[in-house]
Amino acid sequence: MSTTLYDKIFQAHIVDEIGDDALLYIDRHLIHEVTSPQAFDGLAQKGRKVRRPDLTFATMDHSISTRSLAIDACGPANKLQLQTLADNCEANGIQLFPVGHQKQGIVHVMGPELGLIKPGMTVVCGDSHTATHGAFGALAFGIGTSQVEHVFATQTLKQSKGKCMQVKVNGARPLGVTAKDIILAIIGKIGHAGATGCVIEYCGDTIEGLSMEERMTVCNMSIEAGAKAGLIAPDQTTFDYLAGREYAPKGADWDAAVAYWKTLKSDTDAKFDIVVELAATDIAPQVTWGTNPGQVIGVNQPIPAPEDFSDPIDRDSAVKALKYMDIQAGQKLADLTVNHVFIGSCTNGRIEDMRAAAAIAKQGKVAENVTAIVVPGSVAVKAQAEAEQLDKIFLDAGFEWRLPGCSMCLGMNDDILSQGDRCASTSNRNFEGRQGRGARTHLVSPAMAAAAALAGRFADTRDFIAND
């Protein structure tokens, strides 16, 4: 019987079947300081140990300061989280990459760059953006703290099999259109709950033409479409990225692994529950206008009115979003001034993102009304960017160049916005209060964020590219 990539990975990891559910073996468990403490406590209370510490890797990312290497820089509560993670990892023999370690970084940035994620794996983390790792053809999804404890104890997880949605994107990308624009356009088309109950497989010649870092950006925001996970079949681009990385197979093991990885693709006549198609040629640089990622438009489109939506829930959501974001239907995004710009996160904190933003930043100076920060996703990204002197480009233009961490993606550290602030952000969520109480978040690509920083308002990155 013809099967999808999702089917193949799911079936290969079934340890036992429990009614309509399956007990899946977990190949890789990534942890950080926020969702692991209670799981470790539960384990200790029951007198259990971590079953496979060798398959578990930890980093510090959410609660850390991007201004200082001191673990107490974000206050006593965050320090306690970080110290607790360090103590738990030491007690259980888990590899930890703490603040200051050369391999430290945002969990979904450092994992791939170390070669920890491989095609065909099951990957979990107490973090919703675990879907990032689906870019490698791995079944990767976020889990809750009680599930983190279950994986600690058994290296398995009970799961029900979801539907499979195929998203095809074909055609040449227009000037200035990035992977971030592609995934925002997808979410705009299907809605922020459009893939609920599904695993998305992204395909088509546009997707095949993306680099691994671009594929990670696409898969990262699968959760913002309502999906459990996102997948892209591995190919030569995947193999080239993994070759030589620290935790990648070597020698004969590499040859055997690649031979297996080449089988990890949906059969040509596999049936999908839902099929969605987009033409890349129709996509423009995107900006979210509302309070969920599905409320998104091309940079030169007017902000929609509630009556433009046929669904009553969407209409109500639009009314609330317009009020919260302090914008008007019909208004142009170019009329909106921004006072903050954030470039970073597990969505757009990799070296290609730094390069794209720097290509715009070198064309001017940050506007007087704007505070702009650039936060590399890992120590390795920071080092590479500095080797290419990208940090100098940012600093000369008036951006702040920070230490690695999750930073302003979420209001969980010292990079928090204030009431009424408007931010062009390369992160993944624009929910009310996501970057601080009363703050207004607009999701954009790194190039669009850099353009907004220079213009002091939303600007079409294509104008900057044309002048480069």
Curated annotation (Swiss-Prot):
Family in the record: Belongs to the aconitase/IPM isomerase family. LeuC type 1 subfamily.
MF terms (GO), sorted A to Z: 3-isopropylmalate dehydratase activity; 4 iron, 4 sulfur cluster binding; metal ion binding
Lineage: superkingdom: Bacteria
Keywords: 4Fe-4S, Amino-acid biosynthesis, Branched-chain amino acid biosynthesis, Iron, Iron-sulfur, Leucine biosynthesis, Lyase, Metal-binding
Pathway: Amino-acid biosynthesis; L-leucine biosynthesis; L-leucine from 3-methyl-2-oxobutanoate: step 2/4
Cofactor annotation remark: Binds 1 [4Fe-4S] cluster per subunit.
Broad class of enzyme this protein falls into: lyase
One Pfam match: Aconitase
InterPro entries the record matches: 3-IsopropMal_deHydase_lsu (IPR004430), Acnase/IPM_dHydase_lsu_aba_1/3 (IPR015931), Acoase/IPM_deHydtase_lsu_aba (IPR001030), Aconitase_4Fe-4S_BS (IPR018136), Aconitase_4Fe-4S_dom (IPR036008), IPM_dehydratase_rel_enz (IPR050067), IPMI_cat (IPR033941)
Binding site for [4Fe-4S] cluster: 346, 406, 409
Cofactors, names only: [4Fe-4S] cluster
EC number per UniProt: 4.2.1.33
Encoding gene, per UniProt annotation: leuC
Family annotation (HAMAP family): LeuC_type1
Database matches in PROSITE patterns: ACONITASE_1, ACONITASE_2
Presence of keyword Lyase: yes
Protein name: 3-isopropylmalate dehydratase large subunit
Function summary: Catalyzes the isomerization between 2-isopropylmalate and 3-isopropylmalate, via the formation of 2-isopropylmaleate.
GO biological process, any: L-leucine biosynthetic process
Quaternary assembly: Heterodimer of LeuC and LeuD.
Catalytic activity: (2R,3S)-3-isopropylmalate = (2S)-2-isopropylmalate
